[in-house]
Regions:
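N-terminal amphipathic/basic leader segments beginning at the initiator methionine
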Residues: 1-20
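Mg2+-dependent prenyl diphosphate-binding active-site environment of isoprenoid biosynthetic enzymes
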Residues: 17, 22-128
Length: 128
């Protein structure tokens, strides 16, 4: 199971890194990367893959959907740490996004990850 989790996390991260390289949000790439890749096991992707196997959904499609879910998760964590919310200085032992960068960049990076999640899902849905 741990090997599966590691493979799914690696594949999800690979998809996300490749996808973010295509983005035009040049000023926000660093805080988005920091928020997305600051640790975490990508357990949501693993759950998605396990459930998707039951319904014979392709692994590639499940990784794509899992990547979108991870973007939503990162967005919620970035926004949760903001001064107007929990005002947390650290997330997973590292400076939170608004502390590493600034509050405005954290808000925009989180919002961008939210948008990217739906962009990933809509492009995935159009590929039959």
């Amino acid at each position: 199971m741990l090997n599966d989790l590691n493979k799914i996390a690696k594949d999800t991260n690979f998809f996300l890194k490749k996808y973010l390289r295509k983005q035009k949000y040049s000023g926000l790439i660093s805080p988005m990367n920091y928020g997305l890749f600051s640790g975490g096991k990508k357990i949501r992707s693993k759950i998605l893959v396990d459930v998707g196997k039951i319904f014979n959904i392709s692994y590639k499609k499940l990784i794509t959907i899992g990547a979108a879910v991870e973007c939503i998760h990162a967005y919620t964590l970035i926004h949760d740490d903001l001064p107007c919310m929990d005002d947390d200085d650290y997330r997973r032992g590292k400076l939170s996004v608004h502390k590493k960068f600034n509050e405005a960049q954290a808000i925009l990076a989180g919002d961008s990850l939210h948008d990217i999640a739906f962009e990933i899902l809509s492009s995935s849905a159009s590929k039959k």
